[in-house]
């Protein structure tokens, strides 16, 4: 065991040991901040390139799907390439995508660049966080590691649009965030190149048995699902031949994914990974989190823009409020598990309760003269509950699945939470809002368009309240038990590498 402060083995000796993990934490933060087209720049991109809102959303969803797909490959990369090689490649690839996406108006090309950027930013983030995991928790405790990890991951989800919109407001150009992130990523590459050296803790494993085609098929399957719900309102759902063709492709792609999973030796997701008894209920809970989290994307945006007439800068403060909620939720998970020593599964009930508070409060707050400050508490509570769910469900997933299937399980959870469920709920809310508006107008109510919109939004928030309260009652009546009485510990990288070597038959 190393004596003294934690040390990153790949750093050169002149870098202070106490500073080394903080540098990697900064790298992870920069990777997570990066992307292709940034959500905070949506309106500017739409205006400059004359794109539809659905086009820009689809580009962003390509990036989100790209983030979900590398998990089954991550350890194979870690045990073949050095830390220095992985960070250099990830930083340069994401920087290149950020640069190139500024100079094309082709939506398909922007989608591809966004997907590649998402894929490699996850690779860079994993390499940083896996390197400093013993600094974060010397006891290899997942109930410490995941809350701290999600402080950065979820924090960046809300901090990125906040930073983006402020930069665009100051410089009046949506490309400023791409320039900033390109510069930051090139700085990461320069620091890695100058201050690190190649270090291996074991002999490299051959870079084989990677199901690239399976990764592409599962990605296409997710994106076809997202396309249907993103463009559904625009093309009038199944009345359009484009939507009919998309449904047909979705069915065919799903068939090929399943057939390939059962008929090759090393599939992208192994069939055994789907057979755990509690996996399906767990994925349903991930879907519920996405359902509750999708309400701000349609209803809150329609309310703040269509009823209150707030601009982007005014509503941007809500991103900061949600950032504080996410950090508070992750730290509360640490407090619950490590100070109060309570079962992590009981936190799920608290998470449901705080998430349900959001639509309940919004239902009663909807008013044409509402101040922006009135939205702080419901947004904080929603983000707080969302963070609790993400932390504890990931711990539960890790407890449910052995380590060889855990990263496949993260991709399976990503199939639910990284885009598809969010797109489906947003599409259904958009359809519901249009349907409510048409119904209210046909009833001849003595209201103008703004009041009819407000009434429609309140009705949909009411439906969301009923669903959320029903789920909360289920959690109050059903005591979710941990998978085992004592939590598993993180395995050491040497142990994981030897297991992979033995499994693939590389050992002599």
Functional labels for PLM-detected ranges:
Residues 2-4, 9, 13, 446-508:
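Transmembrane-helix exit segments and adjacent C-terminal regions of multi-pass membrane proteins
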Residues 2-7, 15-74, 124-125, 129, ...:
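Extracytoplasmic
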Residues 18-34, 39-40, 97, 268-436, ...:
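12-transmembrane solute porter fold
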Residues 45-47, 77-79, 110, 162-172, ...:
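Interfacial helix-cap and linker-helix signal at transmembrane-aqueous boundaries
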Residues 63-65, 154-155, 323-324, 419-420:
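Short hydrophobic/small-residue motifs within alpha-helical transmembrane segments
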Residues 74-213:
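Helix-loop-helix hairpins in multi-pass membrane proteins, especially solute transporters
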Residues 169-284:
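Hydrophobic transmembrane-helix bundles of small-molecule transporters
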Residues 169-182, 231-241, 343, 430-468:
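A membrane-interface helix-boundary motif in multi-pass transporters
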